[in-house]
Amino acid sequence: MTRLAILLSILAIGLILLIINHDTGRTMGLANDQFGQLVSLGAIATLIGAGILQSRHRFGEGLRQIAIWLFVVLALVSAYVYRFELEGFGNRLLAGLIPGRATIITDSEGQQEVVLQKMLNGHFETTATVDGKDISMLVDTGASNIALTYEDAEKIGLDPANLNFIVTVMTANGRAQAAPVMLQEISIGPITRRNIGATVAAKGKLDQSLLGMSFLSTLEMLQMRTDELRLRD
């Protein structure tokens, strides 16, 4: 068996064991991070040992191969150890490229958070799935309920002609009449709420649908930072 085959076998077996035991957090009595370090050290030791055995014939070439494989092993181990940070970086990058995109991060305890990046207008916006349709919504902690524009209500299948606009609400355009409705389902990433109350604003009275406190207050965590908003179910 060549050095490459031995090295790849060690790494493959170690990776398989880490994947199998990912949820338990431990592999062969060690924390997964410690086991990953042990696997990498074993691979490095094997590589160095094989290089020493052949150093009498091709010392320079052996050192070069060792350096290359050391870099590969360290890169793989680093990617595993910092997997959550790399995932978060990738999600933030996508959020910056796609305005309103909700990104999902998983912390070291396995808990998921939805992260929204602040828009250029200074507000937090996201695309929520409402009764099966994607709706652009403005996160508004000052709004007591979820509020849909007249057009978005039509988009999700509601017929405004059959609604009773009996509720008076305050919008950016002043006082307006709104109709109470019940949404079957609203989701932002993995966070889903069913049978939740909302209102539909009269036509032309609301510029953008609002994600209000009737949804936000049900969350375990709502954390606002300078440039991002974190939601946890």
Curated annotation (Swiss-Prot):
Q: Is-annotated flag, keyword Transmembrane?
A: yes
Transmembrane intervals: 4-24, 35-55, 66-86
Q: Which cysteines are joined by disulfide bonds?
A: none
Q: Kindly give the InterPro entries that the UniProt entry links to this protein.
A: Aspartic_peptidase_AS, Clan_AA_Asp_peptidase_C, Peptidase_aspartic_dom_sf, Retropepsin-like_bacterial
Keyword annotations = Cell membrane, Membrane, Transmembrane, Transmembrane helix
Q: Which BP terms does GO give this entry? A: proteolysis
**Bilayer disposition of the protein:** Multi-pass membrane protein
Cellular localisation: Cell membrane
Give the main localization category: membrane
Q: Name one cellular component (GO) term.
A: plasma membrane
Tell me a Gene Ontology molecular-function term this record carries: aspartic-type endopeptidase activity
Name of this protein:
Uncharacterized protein in cobV 5'region
